[in-house]
């Protein structure tokens, strides 16, 4: 996404943007088949903030192939220094029949105990940085919880607009 596209989205009234950063390790991004680098992800976050987005969320993947506690610590440390207000952190699950399954990626992933340790490490790091956990995989600075998610969990009405949206 370009800075101009980000400005157009902001001017159109879009008030929350979620970016699929996934990791700030170039080695991990390459293993995941992502097309962006860590630096490009960082630059996109700053460009979104400059375009006027004050409610910025980043997706983060945990329990990645060959991921270590040190690598995750570095990613989360860099991530929380960015002008973001929300993080969604998900464990990688390799499903049968997917390209990752065919490539035997699961064999390189941490075992369940290590994955749990990585998750708890991320929870702690995010909490120390002021991101409060409000769902199993979601963390936000005060007042920046996903309104859709909160409405969903409280059985309140919401309106879905756009491709694949539902209400």
Identify the role of each PLM range.
Residues 1-167:
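C-terminal scaffold of the Radical SAM
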């Amino acid at each position: 996404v370009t800075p101009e596209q980000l400005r157009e989205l902001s001017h159109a009234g879009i008030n929350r943007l979620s970016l699929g950063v996934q990791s700030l390790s170039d080695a991990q991004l390459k293993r995941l088949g992502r097309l962006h680098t860590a630096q490009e992800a960082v630059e996109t976050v700053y460009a979104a903030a400059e375009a006027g987005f004050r409610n910025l969320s980043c997706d983060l993947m945990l329990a990645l192939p060959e991921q270590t506690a040190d690598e995750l610590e570095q990613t989360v440390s860099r991530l929380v220094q960015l002008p973001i207000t929300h993080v969604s952190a998900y464990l990688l699950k390799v499903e049968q029949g997917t390209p990752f399954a065919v490539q035997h990626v699961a064999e390189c992933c941490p075992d369940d105990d290590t994955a749990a340790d990585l998750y708890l490490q991320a929870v702690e790091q995010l909490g120390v940085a002021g991101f409060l956990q409000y769902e199993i995989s979601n963390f936000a600075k005060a007042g920046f919880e996903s309104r859709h998610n909160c409405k969903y969990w409280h059985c309140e009405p919401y309106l879905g607009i756009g491709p694949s949206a539902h209400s």
